[in-house]
A protein has these predicted regions:
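RecA-like P-loop NTPase motor core of helicase/translocase proteins
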Residues: 1-166
């Protein structure tokens, strides 16, 4: 997941990643973008174009992906990345998320909710990774410290019991 600072940044990231995939012949991979409303930008030909989430998100057969279908589509093997602008930073319970690139200032509850998208367990998921281009570690740590509480265990626990639930 790439967390961007604006809808304009999201569509620009989208176009750059699409060009990269095409240039390097990653024909079996694709990306999805999530943002609300419509945004205008200048394309490579110098023309003003209006973009929407549905207009950009297409299946291999060319059909458009509606917003209501986005979460389901993300589960398909070809979608390796989701680029977001003020979407899916809260309440997006997706265990498949492993890596997050953050290019947006975060603090407080927004930082906790956004970064916590990665903390869901999934079969085969051993760790997570965050590459943050926009935030200082001490601000993120302070954001989490508000919610941090010490937990004392009365006895030894078996961490593998978590996987039995999956």
């Amino acid at each position: 997941m790439v967390v961007t600072a604006s809808r304009l940044h999201a569509i620009r990231y989208y176009h750059e990643f699409k060009r990269y995939l095409e240039r390097h012949h990653y024909d079996d991979l694709d990306i999805l973008v999530a943002f609300s409303g419509a945004i205008k930008d200048i394309d490579r030909a110098g023309e003003e174009v209006e973009y929407t989430e549905e207009k950009l998100n297409k299946r291999a057969d060319g059909t458009h992906i509606k917003e209501s279908q986005l979460k389901e589509e993300f589960h398909k093997d070809e979608y390796a990345m989701l680029i977001v602008a003020e979407k899916y930073q809260t309440g997006f319970d997706e265990p498949l998320l492993h890596t997050m690139f953050v290019d947006k200032p975060l603090s407080g509850v927004k930082a906790v909710q956004t970064l916590s998208r990665l903390n869901r367990t999934a079969k085969g998921k051993q760790d997570t990774f965050v590459l943050d281009f926009a935030n200082k570690p001490e601000i993120i740590q302070a954001s989490f410290s508000t919610y941090y509480r010490t937990t004392l265990l009365s006895g030894e626990t078996d961490p593998n019991k978590l996987y039995d639930l999956i």
